[in-house]
Each structure stands twice: as C-alpha cells, then as structure tokens.
Amino acid sequence: MKIISPVARALLATTACLSAALPLSAFAGPEEQAAQMHSRLTGVKPSIEVLTAMAQDIASGDAGAAAERAMENDAFYDVTLKNLVTPWTNRDGDNFAPLNDYTATVIGMVRDDVDFRQILSGDILYTGASGLGLPAYNNANNDHYEALEAAGYPLQTALERRTQSSVTGLPSEATAGVMTTRGGAKAFFYAGTNRAMFRFTLMNHLCRDLEQVHDTSRPPDRIRQDVSRSPGGDSRVFQNNCIGCHSGMDPMAQAFAYYNFEYDVDNDPTGENGRLDYNGAGEIDPATGSRVQAKNHINSATFPYGFVIPDDKWDNYWREGPNMHLGWSEVLPGSGNGAKSMGEELANSEAFAQCQVTKVFKQVCLRAPEDSSDRNRIDSITDSFTSNGYRLKQVYAETAAYCAGE
C-alpha cells in the first residue's frame, strides 16, 4: 500500500496551486522574485521574516543566498526533492511511490552536500534517525521507511547517514550507492537479466534511453546467448537494431553479474518481502558453477554461440564511436569489476553532470530549456556543479536565481 503523509499531500497540493497562481511575468522587484523563488523551491509561501531576508539578498545581488534560505524550509526535502527522486525508484516513474531507502539516501545526500557522484558508487545509506520509534531497517521489507513517511517526520531532520555495508551486510566493495539499496534492487534487479538496472540508471542519471545511445559500430562479442541473432528469421533486424543497444549495454551490465533480487514468486509475486542477494567471494551458484547468478545464463539456447558471462568484469565500449561524446573521464580506465567501479564510470561522465542540472532546471523553471540563453546557463551551472564538489543544492540555488527574473 502506498503511504503518503497528510503533510506531503497538502504540500503537493500547495505546489500545484502556487505554480498556477504565480505566473513568471508577474514578478519584478526583489520581494516578488523572492516569493517566486521560495514557491519554486519549496511549494509553500515564505514567512514574512524569510521573505524580507531573501529580498534583501536579491537586492544586494546575492540571489544564491536567497535560494539557500528558501532551501532551509522542510518542504524543500519533503516535497521538492522527493518529487524529483521518487520517479527514479520504480519502472513506472510513479511520483507517488512510497518512501524507501533509495529515495531517502538521495535526499540525505543533498541535505549533507555529499558529492552527488556517490549516488552510483558510495557505501552510503540514509535511515530514519534513532529515537523516532520506527521499525528497524529490514533487508526484506520497506516497513522502516513507510513508517517514517506515515509519521510525517521532516526528512531534513529525521534522516541519519550510515554506511550501507554496516546496515545491510553487503560487502563495502559491493556497494554502489542507490543501485544496491533494497529499493533499487526491488525495482531493477527484479527477475530478468539485470539489464534493467543498467537501462534505468542510464535513463535516470544520464538522461538517455537506449535508443539515444544506439550504435551499430561497436563489436558484438559480449552480446549474450539470450539475444537472437535473427529475430523473426531475419538477421538484418539484429545487425541494424539489436546490436546497436546490446553491444554497448551487455559489457557494461556484466558489472551486475553477482546480484539478484530474491523473492517468493508464488506467494509474493511483486517482491514486497524480497531482498537483495549478492554472491560474495567463495559463493558458487549451482546453475553456473561460479559466482555469476543463474539469471545471467537464462535462455542460453536462443543463440548457443553467444557470450557466456564468467564474472563481473565490465568494459565501456562506448568510449569509442559516437557515444564518446557522453564525456567519459580521462582519468578512469573504462573497465573494471563490479557495480561500484561501473557506477563511477557513469557518474564521472559529462552526461551525468549535465543530466542532473537539466532535471533541476525543468523542475524549478517549470519548463525545458528553450533557447541558447537557457542552454548556455545549463552549461555554466554544470561547470559550477562539477567544480564545486557536485553539490546538488548549489544547482538548485543557481537555477532558481536564473529563473527568478523571468
């Protein structure tokens, strides 16, 4: 059951009402710009004291300081950030999905100005603070976070930073930020072949689906046995379509070879009581004879001569060809073992940084970038983001300052 606190419902409704009632063209002076900035960042009206202080900041030429004041409001975390993050946590992009460890971890990282790249590689997890009377974190359910949300505690003060490995028991070297949270695993390691984790990470954190990175020039040597080389009896379909996604995706998704989301298929088909499973050193899957989870070898008869995953070694074939323009880091090798290093590869790309800025721009400005002025501003905010510790609050502040004058 989806649990949405009464406070969150009220704030969501207020956000919609304020957005409709306060058109950009209505604002001119510092107080009007401050009011607009506060509503865009929080969805609620500022107090007279906060409005006055923000207006003074704007009048003195420091709109960023005004935005920082606005973000001290609980609604920035409970509504604005939650609205941004929640769709990333499920395949349907449902904005009203229950709070979980994926959502809470991102919100906590933003609050604490944690380098946002750690979202895909860090040994990091945010839980409800001790002393709140919540059920303990459980690897096999979401009760802790649903109780936190139902109680209506402000996330700005209720979240506590911990290491993922100490809470879940996952080895530190196997942690990979939100990808290895229970919420992430339930959504994207559920059934299938773990390619979903790669695809949705690409969509949510590089702002690109597979069609946008389609490249038929990459070698097909790592495409697995479960991909037909002649769909419908026509090999041209594989050569012109399938290869364009799988040649790059499959060698990257191999990083997830040791992960699975275990659940009772018959009695718990949606995995509400499922848990992340990881084959550590010395653990052997009887179906594969190695640490590789059995799901990675399914449908092997589709094309028996295809690639058989032996381990979790990944390689980024997109460092060459048209996808080199995603801006891969020159200091990283472009290959490695496991989800952590693969997450670092994605998070250190230029595409990752620009994606975060673009998402915030759309949320705060209530529109997509429209012209060269917008695009230039996104470029400058992205440069600031990457040069100053990947602080997402800074992105919000600079974006709100840009839109406040519209």
Give, region by region, the residue ranges found by the protein language model.
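N-terminal signal peptide c-region/cleavage motif recognized by signal peptidases
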Residues: 21-23
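Extended surface/linker regions that mediate inter-domain or inter-protein docking
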Residues: 65-252, 347, 351, 361-364, ...
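Electron-transfer interface patches adjacent to heme c in soluble/periplasmic c-type cytochromes
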Residues: 68, 168, 180-194, 228-229, ...
